[in-house]
Amino acid sequence: MGRFIFLSFGLLVVFLSLSGTGADCPSGWSSYEGHCYKPFNEQKNWADAENFCTQQHTGGHLVSFHSTEEADFVVKLAFQNFGHGIFWMGLSNVWNQCSWQWSSAAKLKYEAWAEESYCVYFKSTNNKWRSRACRMEAYFVCEFQA
């Protein structure tokens, strides 16, 4: 009886110590602060990459950053897996919801935008953001909440 209780307690300790770690993420995914991340070694345009991420796991999307530490973790993950490269993140102006205003403070009434949308990427060598046309291809990192 004492051996059963000891074994049960031991299993409980192991289970509790694994919660909140990489054990919450599927094989091949990396865990950080309750989210799972995976860089993919194939290039897609931004929309196709986002669509791909939504198909990988419920709640999946292109990576979004909410702290320097999170960005550093993902940049390091991308570099360790694939070396140098550029990777899409989930930030874009695809929906063109920017609030534009003329320097004269006049309201924008006339528009003649080109159809080009811009999306944001990071280099696997640092976590500085840059933008490029969403139609161009890049590697990407998917994320979902564990």
Curated annotation (Swiss-Prot):
Residues 32-143 form the C-type lectin domain. Keywords: Blood coagulation cascade inhibiting toxin, Calcium, Disulfide bond, Hemostasis impairing toxin, Metal-binding, Secreted, Signal, Toxin. It holds the Pfam family Lectin_C. It comes from the Eukaryota. InterPro entries: C-type_lectin-like, C-type_lectin-like/link_sf, C-type_lectin/snaclec_domain, C-type_lectin_CS, CTDL_fold. The keyword Secreted applies. Residues 1-23 form the signal peptide. One of its GO terms (cellular component) is extracellular region. The keyword Signal applies. Disulfide bonds join 25-36, 53-142, 119-134. Calcium is required for ligand binding. When linked to subunit A of IX/X-bp, anticoagulant protein which binds to the gamma-carboxyglutamic acid-domain regions of factors IX (F9) and factor X (F10) in the presence of calcium with a 1 to 1 stoichiometry. When linked to subunit A of IX-bp, anticoagulant protein which binds to the gamma-carboxyglutamic acid-domain regions of factor IX (but not to factor X) in the presence of calcium with a 1 to 1 stoichiometry. Belongs to the snaclec family. Heterodimer with subunit A of IX/X-bp or IX-bp; disulfide-linked. This is Snaclec coagulation factor IX/factor X-binding protein subunit B.
